[in-house]
Amino acid sequence: MRRIVALRRIIWDAAGHFNDDDGWAMASYLAISALMAIFPFLIFATTLASFLGAQAFAETAVHLVFDTWPEQIAAPIAREVVTVLTVQRGDLLTYGVALAAFFASNGIEALRTSLNRAYRVVETRSIWYRRTQSLGFVLIATIGFVVISILLVFAPLIARFLEANFEWIKPYMGTITLWRFIIASTVIVLGLVAVHIWLPDGRRPLLDIVPGIIFTLAGWLIGSTLFATYLDNFSSYVTTYAGLASIMIAVVFLYIVSVIFILGGELNASIRRYLDARAKVGA
C-alpha cells in the first residue's frame, strides 16, 4: 500500500509540474527544433563523412535515424532526406556546412532547455560553454555515425567470415536489417544517457536517470505503435493536408516523442524529490 501511495505521489508530482510549467508548449518547441535540426545535422554529417572517405554514409545515416520510426512516418521523410544528402556540395569548411552544424546544435539546445525545465534547475553555465558543448554533441554524433557506417559496410564480410569459421554462431547472426535496428536502438539509449547526464545544469548519478530513460523508451515504443496504427486505420492526413501530409505526420510524431521525453525528465526529478523528502523525514 505504501508503494502505491508513493508511486501515485511521484506520478502526480511529475504530471502536475509538466502541466504547470508549460510542458505542452515546451514539447512543441522541442518537436519543431528537432525537425529543423535533422536536415542540417545530416547535411553536416554527410559532408564530413565524404571528407573522411565514408562515401556510403547517406544511406547508413538514414537507416540509423529512421529505422526506429514507424514505417508510415519514416518512409516519406527518408526519401526526401536521401534526395537532400545526395546533392553534391563543396569543401567541408564552407559557410553552408558551418551553418548546418550551428542549426543542428539548436536541436541540442532545445533538449537542454526542456530538461532544465523538467529537472527544475536554472541554467548557470555561460552561453559559450553551452554552444561549444552542443557543437561537441553534434560532432561526436557525426563521428559515431561515420564509424557505424564504416562498420556496416564491413558487416557482411565479417558475418561471412564468422559463419565460415564458427558454425555455432549462424543462428545468432540474424540479418543486416536486424543489426541495423539493434545498432540504432543502442545509439538511442546511449544518446538518452548522455543528454540526461550532461545537458541539464547540475550533476545527476546514473541511477537517478535510469527510471526516466526506461519510461522514455517504453513510451516511445507504445506511442509510435499507437500513432502508426492510427495512421493505418483512421487517419485523414493525406486528404486534409495533401502535399503537406508527410510534414504534418512528422510534426505530430515528434510532438508525441517530445512529450514523452520531457515526462521522462519530470519523472526522474519527482523521484529524486520524493527520496530527498523521505530522507529528511527519516533524519
Q: Where are the regions that the model predicts?
A:
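Membrane-embedded alpha-helices and immediately adjacent juxtamembrane helical segments
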Residues: 1-283
